[in-house]
């Protein structure tokens, strides 16, 4: 049986790879205009050192003009069986109207953002998204999940 890879087509997005030899299984998608030098600099700088952790911005509303989302395999081994388990990890970097970057590795936040852009498209300078960063309680007492939602 063959595995079929499926993806979601998202408008305003460009697939990005920095894997020169083509062996990486990591995937990245950005809505930044990589023909615009200023946005290229935003993209590169955020890869090395984002301005803010999105987790520290709960309760804030951000006007987002760009985003980079990533998906990469994370390999672990079941200690009891020795079975190799590969799960997908996600990253999300948002860029505001002032060029500041906000990063998270929260899977819940990634999926909340993916749900938004599936219907609205990725944010751009011409079509920004106004997003509110929220923390919602988890079933486990004392734990919260980070999410983004459309700001009112």
Predicted regions mapped to residue ranges:
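Short nucleic-acid-contacting surface segments enriched for D/E, G, S/T with interspersed K/R
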Residues: 57, 112-132
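A composition-driven signal for long, intrinsically disordered, charge-rich low-complexity tracts
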Residues: 25, 106-108, 128
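Short, charged beta-turn/beta-strand-edge "cap" motif at the junction between a beta-strand
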Residues: 123-125, 132-152
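GIY-YIG-like beta-to-alpha core
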Residues: 102-115
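OB-fold ssDNA-binding interfaces and closely related basic DNA-contact patches used
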Residues: 1-99, 141-143, 150-152
């Amino acid at each position: 049986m063959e595995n079929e890879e499926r993806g979601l087509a998202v408008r305003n997005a460009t697939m990005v790879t920095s894997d020169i030899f083509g062996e990486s299984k990591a995937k990245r998608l950005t809505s930044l205009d990589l023909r615009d030098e200023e946005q290229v600099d935003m993209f590169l700088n955020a890869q090395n050192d984002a301005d803010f952790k999105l987790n520290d911005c709960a309760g804030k509303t951000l006007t987002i003009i760009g985003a980079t989302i990533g998906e990469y395999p994370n390999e672990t081994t079941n200690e009891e069986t020795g079975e190799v388990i590969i799960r997908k990890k996600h990253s999300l970097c948002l860029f505001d109207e002032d060029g500041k970057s906000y990063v998270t590795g929260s899977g819940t936040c990634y999926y909340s953002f993916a749900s938004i852009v599936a219907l609205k498209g990725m944010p751009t300078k011409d079509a920004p998204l106004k997003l509110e960063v929220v923390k919602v309680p988890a079933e486990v007492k004392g734990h919260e999940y980070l999410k983004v939602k459309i700001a009112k």
